């Protein structure tokens, strides 16, 4: 089924088209949810909620960009909204904002296996993990992140810097990374 046929069918609430859309995009979108979630079950819940929104908002897609990108934005916003409902997420952002932490200069480790990086990202505190995902992986600006998370732009920047440093430390500790402070792009591996 072509993407156009899927879109047309989904607009008519045809179950076959909805199933095709879900089967085509759910694996990639589950990976997005998994980067934000605490566990696989939470990621699957976010995915289901996100696709419900995709189907209910199908009439708003205007063919001005990639359909997959439109779905991804809905899924990311669904993940963020779920995290914002989570008290631990808000407390994490408040604690980090209140306690300034000195971090080393920006450093970028060498390219490692994407799966290993994703697993290490999941170890990060939820506030760090969320900002890192949004900025480095999803490509949002710090201004957009500050709007999404209701935080200051400077908080987004500091969360991102601290997340990168903490992630580098985790990668070194797990012996996934052996040379700290290499100037190569390693987050590209998880996009």
What name fits each language-model region?
Residues 9, 91, 147-148, 164-191:
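C-terminal edge and immediately downstream basic/flexible tail or linker adjoining helix-turn-helix-like DNA-binding
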Residues 59-63, 73-93, 110:
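Arg/Lys-rich amphipathic alpha helix in sigma70-family domain 2
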Residues 7-31:
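A short, charge-rich alpha-helical start-of-domain segment used by transcription regulators
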Residues 11-12, 48-66, 85-87:
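Sigma70-family region 2
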Residues 22-40, 57, 121, 173:
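Amphipathic, Lys/Arg- and hydrophobic-enriched alpha-helical face
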Residues 31, 45-52, 65-77:
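Structural recognition of an alpha-helix C-terminal capping motif at a helix-to-coil junction
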Residues 119-130, 138-155, 169:
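Helix-turn-helix DNA-binding module
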């Amino acid at each position: 089924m072509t993407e156009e046929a899927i879109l047309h069918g989904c607009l008519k609430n045809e179950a076959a088209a909805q199933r095709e859309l879900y089967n085509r995009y759910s694996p990639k979108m589950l990976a997005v949810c998994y980067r934000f979630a605490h566990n696989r079950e939470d990621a699957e819940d976010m995915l289901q909620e996100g696709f419900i929104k995709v189907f209910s908002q199908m009439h708003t897609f205007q063919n001005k960009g990639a359909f997959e990108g439109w779905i991804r934005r809905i899924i990311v916003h669904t993940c963020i909204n779920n995290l914002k409902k989570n008290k631990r997420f808000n407390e994490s952002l408040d604690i980090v904002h209140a306690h300034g932490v000195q971090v080393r200069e920006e450093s970028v480790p060498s390219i490692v296996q994407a799966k290993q990086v994703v697993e290490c990202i999941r170890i990060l505190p939820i506030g760090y993990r969320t900002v890192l995902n949004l900025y480095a992986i999803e490509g949002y600006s710090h201004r957009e992140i500050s709007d999404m998370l209701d935080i200051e732009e400077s908080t987004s920047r500091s969360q991102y810097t601290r997340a990168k440093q903490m992630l580098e430390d985790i990668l070194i500790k797990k012996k996934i990374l052996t040379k700290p402070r290499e100037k190569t792009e390693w987050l590209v591996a998880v996009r």
